[in-house]
Structure formats: C-alpha cells, structure tokens
Amino acid sequence: MSDPRPARAVVVGIDGSRAATHAALWAVDEAVNRDIPLRLVYVIDPSQLSAAGEGGGQSAARAALHDASRKVEATGQPVKIETEVLCGRPLTKLMQESRSAAMLCVGSVGLDHVRGRRGSVAATLAGSALCPVAVIHPSPAEPATTSQVSAVVAEVDNGVVLRHAFEEARLRGVPLRAVAVHAAETPDDVEQGSRLAHVHLSRRLAHWTRLYPEVRVDRAIAGGSACRHLAANAKPGQLFVADSHSAHELCGAYQPGCAVLTVRSANL
C-alpha cells in the first residue's frame, strides 16, 4: 500500500541559503490566511554528500530547518510549523510535494547552486509544479527577519492569474497593478492599440473589482511583451503573478527584492 499524501500545507524548500529563509518568511502569511501548516522541507541529495556522509547531511538539514523555524517563530504570527528531511533529488522531491501542497515557496538561488545551475530548480518548479509556486529573490539589503510585499503586478489576459493576483493583494493589503499589452509597429497602431487595450483592461477588471472592492487597482498599458514590461518596471517588494508558461522568462528577469508567483490554469 502506498503512503497517504501529507495534509494540505504551504510547503517551503529549505537548504540553508538566505533566499530559502526569505521564502519561509514570505510564506507565513499564506499559511496563516489559509489556516493550514507551514511545512519546511529540506531535501538531502545523496549525490552531493561529502565525506561526512549521510550523518553530515542530516546534521546540516536539521540545522537549516531549526534556523528557518526560529526565524518564522520570531515573526509572532500564529502559524503551525512542520519540518521534514527528505532524501533524493531536490527537484523530484519538491515536485512530489506539489501534488498536495496549497502552495510551494522556494528561494531564487540555492537548492542546486552547487552544480552551478543558478536558480534552475526554482524556475523549473515554477513552470512545472502542480500547485502555485512562489519564487522569492531577496534584496541583499533586506534582513532575513522579514519579507514584505509592497504591490502585486499582473497581466490581465488570464483569468486564473487575475484571481490569484487579486487574492494576494487582498491578503497583503497592497495595491494591484494590472497591465494590458498591445502589439504595435506604427504610430497609428500605437494609438489604436492603446485605445483598444484600455477597453480590454476595463472589461477584464470589471468582474474582479466587484469581487474585491477593498483592493486598489492601478492600471497600465504596455507595448510588446508583458514579461519584458514587468521586468523593466520592477521595484523591490513587488510580487509578479503570472501563468506558469512565463516562469522561465520571468524568473530570469525580475530584480532583487521581488517575487514571482506562477499559477497553472488548473490551479483554481
């Protein structure tokens, strides 16, 4: 008989890195809002064990989980913390966690940094996991004691993305910047495209502003690629909400101090 799936939780990949600690702090509000546990998971990769062997790997895992738990507890938030050490490839194990997780949170670096593939696990999870994935990229100046969101940013074409964006803005009490994109090659195209984009933006937002009247919405029109616009206008504290198909492009382009939340169309 197979093992039962773990209870639903907000899962954070912990590896001892500063980015992972920020991911745990960022995830606290998500767990508290859902009234579910915050599950901190450390994955020991057998192929990366040193001469100290499994014992050394277990010690490092316990130390990293203890440090992350202590920092979460220091927030004073009423969150239930669970910890677990798993053995295997980080990407494989975290993908398995995504089957039952309400959300998966990881740092933008770490997990696979020893192989020189900066952020590869995070970007792959963001594009392929079975639940929403938050990738946290802390600013070097931001202390590992808190992780704040100052604004949510989303492109309006995807209704699932908009729903998650409004929910995040409501949860964190911050404004939502809604972006509509148009493609234009001539001045006439720009004028016409901008006018149509404004109409499209108003139509797309009408339903959600009725459902979330407490969320302040700032509107923006952009030409060309939504990902390029979001990256070019990134500011510390912003949370970009996007479809998982944009994960690799966004995870490689956003600025320190920002975060990306990717959702699949099935993540309703």
Curated annotation (Swiss-Prot):
Pfam families: Usp
InterPro entries given in the database record: Rossmann-like_a/b/a_fold, Universal_stress_UspA, UspA
Cellular component, GO annotation: peptidoglycan-based cell wall; plasma membrane
Gene3D superfamilies: HUPs
Keyword DNA-binding: no
Swiss-Prot/TrEMBL keywords: ATP-binding, Nucleotide-binding
Binding site for ATP: G13, G107, S108, V109, G110, L111, D112, H113, R117, S120, V121
Induction: A member of the dormancy regulon. Induced in response to reduced oxygen tension (hypoxia), low levels of nitric oxide (NO) and carbon monoxide (CO). It is hoped that this regulon will give insight into the latent, or dormant phase of infection. Member of the Rv3134c-devR-devS operon.
GO MF terms, alphabetically ordered: ATP binding
Knockout-associated phenotype: A strain lacking this gene does not induce most genes of the dormancy regulon, due to polar effects on the downstream devR (dosR) gene. Restoration of induction only occurs when both this gene and devR (dosR) are transformed into the deleted strain.
GO biological process: response to hypoxia; response to stress
Residues passing through the membrane, by range: none
Family that this chain belongs to: Belongs to the universal stress protein A family.
Record protein name field: Universal stress protein Rv3134c
Natural source organism: Mycobacterium tuberculosis (strain ATCC 25618 / H37Rv)
